Design a protein with these regions (language model features):
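Predominantly soluble domains enriched in secretory-pathway, periplasmic, or organellar proteins
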Residues: 12, 16-324
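Bacterial N-terminal signal peptides that target proteins for export
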Residues: 1-9
């Protein structure tokens, strides 16, 4: 009897001290606060704040959802956070000033853009070791990877190029010139195209992944706004490859683009200085980080209307959502 009571007591204590689990938790990096805000995507309410390293920017969740990776840019490291306990449990050797990164489809390799050193650092996530350092253009930032994991794309902001890198040899195999200050690279789900945003150029270049040539350039025009105020940054493409969302920076809008015709269909007004985007796993919402209004916006992907804005920390930048 005493043994049974002891087991029940231990179970009760474990229940009390265990962290609550939120379905499809949204993680937002706040670069001024040095925090990550967790939002429950079902209730669209913030539930917890985690203290992290200095100037957090890039953020992503491991494929199994057990760990959160955060670029602590001014600490020159990538921090590892346990998504069950929300404690920092380790770090990865990222190289100096990690800005953005991308995880391989199998979740085993992390590719990190090191803006200060003009490098892409390749990290074995499990072993926590550097596999390679790849020299790229000046001020690398945007990172994308093909669905088959064979090709990684890095954008260099000052060189104005998209570098296509073979993930086996870790060699650059193609350089594609794009417009000024490319900030993000996103593959279509079928791997046929890479979309590269140009913040100062005001365009998104659509690159054919087979020929490594720009096949189309998407430009944006918003009544009442100067062209210089429209600065494309984050890009996301729906799972069916039919629609894309582009964050337009100080234009305070997200552009909705037909990903088959490349026509802009709508501009969605969100918070101030929109940076990055992420889909919920079910694809029902795309979430924007709004840096100067210190909030995020949930956008319904059926109506392409904003549903709710949620206050987070100071200067939200990156966003990711835990898988189902």
């Amino acid at each position: 009897m005493q043994g049974l009571l002891r087991q029940l007591y231990c179970a009760a204590v474990a229940t009390v001290i265990a962290q609550p689990a939120w379905a499809n938790a949204v993680y937002v990096s706040n670069e001024k606060d040095n925090t990550v805000t967790i939002i429950d995507s079902d209730t669209m309410e913030p539930v917890k704040t985690i203290n992290v390293g200095q100037r957090p920017r890039g953020i992503t969740v491991s494929r199994d959802g057990k760990f959160l990776y955060v670029c602590a840019s001014d600490d020159d490291t990538v921090e590892i956070i346990d998504t069950a306990t929300h404690e920092i449990v380790g770090s990865l050797p990222s190289g100096p000033d990690p800005e953005l990164f991308v995880l391989s489809p199998d979740g085993k390799t992390l590719y990190v853009a090191n803006e200060d050193d003009n490098l892409v650092t390749v990290i074995d996530v499990e072993q926590k070791t550097v596999l390679a350092e790849i020299p790229v253009g000046v001020e690398p930032e945007g990172m994308g990877i093909s669905p088959d994991g064979k090709t990684m794309v890095n954008t260099s902001e000052t060189t104005n190029m998209a570098h296509f890198i073979d993930t086996t040899s870790h060699e650059i195999v193609s350089n594609v010139l794009v417009d000024a200050r490319p900030r993000f690279a996103q593959f279509k789900p079928d791997g046929s195209e890479v979309w590269v945003s140009a913040e100062i150029g005001g365009t998104v270049s659509v690159i054919n992944n087979a020929t490594r040539e720009v096949k189309h350039k998407i430009s944006f025009e918003i009544q009442g706004l100067r062209s210089e105020a429209i600065q494309p940054v984050g890009v996301r493409i729906t799972a069916d490859g039919k629609k894309a969302y582009v964050a337009l920076g100080p234009a305070n809008r997200v552009a909705v683009v037909n990903a088959e015709t490349y026509e802009v269909e709508k501009y969605v007004l969100v918070g101030q200085r929109v940076w990055q985007l992420a889909f919920t796993p079910d694809g029902k919402y795309v979430i924007s980080t709004n840096g100067l209004s210190n909030d995020i916006t949930f956008i319904d992907t059926q109506s392409d209307e904003p549903v709710k804005s949620v206050t987070v920390g100071a200067l939200p930048w990156g966003v990711t959502v835990a898988p189902n």
